[in-house]
Amino acid sequence: MEPTSKKLTGRLMLAVGGAVLGSLQFGYNTGVINAPQKVIEEFYNQTWVQRYGEPIPPATLTTLWSLSVAIFSVGGMIGSFSVGLFVNRFGRRNSMLMMNLLAFVSAVLMGFSKLGKSFEMLILGRFIIGVYCGLTTGFVPMYVGEVSPTELRGALGTLHQLGIVVGILIAQVFGLDSIMGNQELWPLLLSVIFIPALLQCILLPFCPESPRFLLINRNEENRAKSVLKKLRGTADVTRDLQEMKEESRQMMREKKVTILELFRSAAYRQPILIAVVLQLSQQLSGINAVFYYSTSIFEKAGVQQPVYATIGSGIVNTAFTVVSLFVVERAGRRTLHLIGLAGMAGCAVLMTIALALLERLPWMSYLSIVAIFGFVAFFEVGPGPIPWFIVAELFSQGPRPAAIAVAGFSNWTSNFIVGMCFQYVEQLCGPYVFIIFTVLLVLFFIFTYFKVPETKGRTFDEIASGFRQGGASQSDKTPEELFHPLGADSQV
């Protein structure tokens, strides 16, 4: 291994930083709708009165608000499933650049919805930015994974999740009543997304196209070699080129991989199952339930200023993503995911106990806060960042876009289900709702322990070869048995 292969060059930092602005958009638009709920509902009511001369019926208001929140995930499902249509035709970088048009259109619709006295404009804007974010959750991990050297792929892949949590935190802070979450400024709160979109439009033209896309998809070896030299900061990129050429030869031996082929072929069935289950482990862990309803959970816990406690959880969220960034290449993906799932299960039990005993023991409110902060911290150790970039690692260049589309669709669909159902399940189960998530977390832990391989320090082709060699006959082996022959020690 050349000593320069671990080098974090300026061009590599620019490429990853430019891409991760899309992740920040995703996080911001996930969190921005919660804080100004009451003032936006008042806008809906005023608009209804102006149109029909009477206050909006409560059931209609609830439906419109639920639609405003949920339509974002519907857009995300459509966007995530469309990833392959763009990245193979236009390239990774150009696809990210083009999609900013959606962000600009959405910003205009939401920003002028109050002036236009139209809640339909706001809902349509939420749908369009949802499509943008769905595409982003495919484009960014794919691009970052393909421009990063093997030894830095996990750490740089974690930056996608860091962008998301920073976006959520910014949305929580901007959404404070004293800043933009008020009657006058909420349209600006929703439309400020044009700023990162504009910044990304400025930066991306200076970022290189994915060298893997150039060599394997376009057969432009000279361009790929030139890009690699800039990304790696060295003239000797022989190892990277050889690895890509081997992957290209393997891809030529395979027929074109469609989404259906991922499930039909024995070589892809296990990795696509792993990819989907890891995405489900992120969304069905209960983290979105905590974020969607954190303010009301803190209120039930007796916290005097719940909105600031929610921001506190956002800070914890960000801090532990940074921790994951520094340890993912040392501890490995699988280990961190297992630690995160186990820790979240323990915190979910604590949260259940605290909420159940709150009326009899007021000091349990403090335990609930500790449990929520712990839950968020363990999420960012593993289940937060790892499912995003490990999908790109599990597949070679050919099936990667289709696999990322399926995984992203699974993520957004489960996100939508949790967002729509949690409130009703919480009303039914009361403080015991997090027991459901505890059971799911334990099941995901068992699956990860027995089925998920360690990808740390391995090239894309080595990981894919492990599945090809193993096939269906290897599916019952432990991750250590499955990947032991690959000689990963030489890569670390």
Curated annotation (Swiss-Prot):
Region (Disordered): 468-492
Post-translational modification: Phosphorylation at Ser-226 by PKC promotes glucose uptake by increasing cell membrane localization.
Family: Belongs to the major facilitator superfamily. Sugar transporter (TC 2.A.1.1) family. Glucose transporter subfamily.
Protein name from the UniProt record: Solute carrier family 2, facilitated glucose transporter member 1
Origin species: Bos taurus
Activity regulation description: The uptake of glucose is inhibited by cytochalasin B. Glucose uptake is increased in response to phorbol ester 12-O-tetradecanoylphorbol-13-acetate (TPA) treatment: TPA-induced glucose uptake requires phosphorylation at Ser-226.
Keyword terms: Acetylation, Cell membrane, Glycoprotein, Membrane, Phosphoprotein, Sugar transport, Transmembrane, Transmembrane helix, Transport
Topology, Extracellular side: 34-66, 113-120, 177-185, 294-306, 356-365, 423-429
Domain of life the protein comes from: Eukaryota
Binding site for D-glucose: 161, 282-283, 288, 317, 380, 388
Bilayer topology: Multi-pass membrane protein
Regions of this protein lying in the Cytoplasmic compartment: 1-11, 88-90, 145-155, 207-271, 329-334, 389-401, 451-492
Keyword Iron-sulfur carried by entry: no
